[in-house]
Amino acid sequence: MQIWAGLGNPGPKYALHRHNVGFMACDVIAEMHGFEPVQKKFQGWVQEGRIGSEKVLLLKPGTFMNESGRAIGEAMRFYKLEPQDVTVFYDELDLEPFKIKVKRGGGAAGHNGIRSTIRHIGEDFRRIRIGIGHPGHKDRVTGHVLGNYAKAEQDDLVQMLGAIGAEAEWLAKGDDARFMSDIALRLQA
């Protein structure tokens, strides 16, 4: 079993924020792969399903971004899993918008949701970094991260999320390189 957690803030007013792209990725994966209905569990919302032959628990923490690790740690301990069984989808300022990178281990790089996750489960989990781009000046970061995607970005957002959902089987199989390359090919088309 694997836990795939999408980071974001709960509530409709945050739903379209760039900071919630991890939640969006989980929603698309659940829809494309026919996951079970949402249940309230582990201080958040979960959906169970299969991707290929792998059982996957999708988790959207309801703790707000800065405490995301509490929900992830609780789910990991309940299922007696290791950090290596956890994948976290989140927004990344230091990547161009709609670019995807997979990374295992490392620090938080200023991301409070990742910092919380490290605090609760350690560093050795897989991260799906979803580029949101940097606004240029540090004074504009908060407004950018907590801002909605622009109308002009909607097509790219839908295409990128669809690519994540369509290529999720490679993540389930542990083939991070194939996941990234197939997404890049889909986004170039």
UniProtKB/Swiss-Prot annotation:
Keywords in alphabetical order: Cytoplasm, Hydrolase, RNA-binding, tRNA-binding
Catalytically driven reaction(s): an N-acyl-L-alpha-aminoacyl-tRNA + H2O = an N-acyl-L-amino acid + a tRNA + H(+)
Organism domain of life: Bacteria
Give the active-site positions. 19 (proton acceptor)
Compartmental location: Cytoplasm
Site label Stabilizes the basic form of H active site to accept a proton, positions:
91
| GO molecular function, a single term | peptidyl-tRNA hydrolase activity
Q: Which InterPro entries match?
A: Pept_tRNA_hydro (IPR001328), Pept_tRNA_hydro_CS (IPR018171), Pept_tRNA_hydro_sf (IPR036416)
Q: What is this protein called?
A: Peptidyl-tRNA hydrolase
Q: Which gene encodes it?
A: pth
